[in-house]
């Protein structure tokens, strides 16, 4: 009897050890993830949709925001622990696999100045982004909306909402002076709007009430534990933002310019170097933490490949954290994931004053990205604030055409 008990105990220990080293599985198919953003005393749930695909023991996760598909290949499972490493940016999800269709953990955001953790959970075999019922929408808000953020406050600013609504489904974005809020997707139920975006840097939630066919009120925008703002909007098909080419200009007396910085391997770099001498050059003021900079870099990577043999160069001037080594790692990941072959430099710590110290020929600085176009003599021909990315649809297509036409014009000049 004692021998039998001892044998059973050994078998139990043996199978327990085997089980401890066994990877947990994830359910394939549609999932609904939720990031909880605590702002003051309020908990805001930011939902997003993703799918899971398994290839033996390897998983690929695809995050969906309207037309955007973000393929995440760095998915690590160890026992019942899951780590999802976002492409391009450094954000991560760390979770415990409670069951094949259930996760709980945290979303870790690595910002330009600080990092923070937010609670996260997810459920498999769920397709809906928002759980708010199927009440028939009272209004269709497709169109262009002049939007005031923090209305009536001293820090009030203007953005433009562009929405497409079909039944209860809504998608769109907001244009701003620094670019756009990328791909938003959500639901209209009754007189209420809910839209969100999670893309590896943004964790955005927009919600509001539709007062009537031309007025949106009681809007709340949440982006982080320290970012919550009110917004209202009126429908205006003629709404426009300030001209992005007139926001920042060049100080008098700067006929040609130069920059002198070190590359990521600490080698000196100047516009007088043979690589840049006599070439049309873009100076891209950016950050590896900036979603609009990602959209611009993805386009610039193609632009560079198409025109580099015709005397065209781009230099990414990255404003990051104080820590050079951490910044270098982030810049290199950003460059690698976007397959950009042009030069990226660490230009200093993020902040307006630091940008103006590095680039003293600018009259002002309004936001990332800011793009400086130089002709073959390295005279500044244009300073463009912001970048309207693919989430803006026709505005993105128009901007790409304008950039290509302007580059070709500069290349034709003697």
Q: Where does each model-flagged region fall?
A:
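Structural microenvironment flanking redox-active thiols in thiol-disulfide oxidoreductases
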Residues: 295-339, 350-358
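N-terminal "domain-start" segment that seeds a small globular fold
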Residues: 236-273
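Thiol-/selenol-based redox modules, centered on thioredoxin-like
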Residues: 367-414
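Surface-exposed beta-loop interaction hotspot
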Residues: 116-149, 244-250, 256-258
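Short active-site neighborhood of thiol/selenol oxidoreductases, capturing the structured segment around
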Residues: 270-294, 300
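Bacterial Sec-dependent N-terminal signal peptides
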Residues: 1-30
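Central antiparallel beta-sheet cores of small beta-barrel/beta-sandwich binding domains
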Residues: 27-96, 130-132, 139-209
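Structural micro-motif
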Residues: 339-343, 362-372
């Amino acid at each position: 009897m004692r021998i039998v008990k001892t044998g059973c105990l050994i078998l139990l220990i043996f199978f327990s050890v085997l089980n401890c080293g066994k990877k947990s599985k994830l359910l394939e198919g549609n999932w609904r993830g939720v990031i909880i953003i605590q702002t003051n005393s309020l908990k805001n749930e930011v939902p997003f949709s993703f799918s899971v695909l398994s290839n033996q023991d390897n998983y690929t996760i695809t995050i969906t925001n309207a037309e955007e598909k973000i393929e995440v290949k760095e998915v690590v499972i160890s026992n019942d622990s899951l780590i999802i490493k976002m492409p391009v940016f450094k954000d991560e999800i760390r979770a415990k696999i409670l069951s094949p269709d259930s996760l709980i953990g945290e979303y870790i955001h690595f910002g330009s100045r600080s990092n923070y953790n937010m609670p996260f959970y997810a459920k498999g075999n769920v397709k809906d982004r928002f759980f708010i019922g199927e009440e028939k929408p009272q209004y269709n808000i497709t169109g262009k909306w002049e939007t005031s953020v923090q209305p009536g406050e001293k820090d009030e600013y203007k953005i433009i909402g562009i929405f497409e609504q079909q039944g209860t489904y809504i998608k769109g974005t907001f244009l701003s002076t620094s670019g756009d809020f990328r791909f938003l997707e959500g639901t209209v139920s009754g007189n209420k709007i809910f839209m969100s975006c999670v893309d590896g840097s943004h964790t955005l939630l927009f919600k509001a009430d539709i007062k009537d066919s031309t007025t949106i009120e009681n809007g709340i925008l949440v982006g982080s534990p320290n970012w919550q703002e009110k917004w209202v909007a009126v429908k205006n098909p003629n709404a426009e933002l300030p001209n992005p080419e007139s926001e920042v200009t060049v100080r008098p007396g700067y006929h040609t310019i130069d920059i002198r910085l070190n590359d990521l391997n600490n080698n000196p770099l100047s516009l007088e170097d043979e690589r840049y001498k006599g070439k049309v050059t873009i100076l891209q003021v950016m950050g590896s933490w900036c979603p609009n900079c990602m959209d611009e870099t993805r386009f610039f990577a193609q632009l560079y490949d198409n025109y580099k043999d015709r005397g065209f160069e781009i230099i990414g001037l990255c404003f990051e954290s104080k820590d050079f080594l951490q910044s270098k790692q982030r810049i290199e990941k950003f460059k690698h994931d976007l397959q950009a072959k042009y030069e990226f430099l660490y230009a200093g710590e993020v902040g307006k004053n630091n940008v103006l110290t590095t680039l003293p020929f600018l009259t002002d600085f309004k936001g990332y990205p800011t793009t400086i176009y130089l002709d073959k003599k390295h005279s500044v021909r244009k300073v463009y604030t912001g970048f309207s990315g693919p989430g803006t649809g026709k505005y993105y297509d128009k901007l790409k055409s304008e950039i290509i036409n302007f580059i070709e014009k500069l290349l034709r000049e003697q």
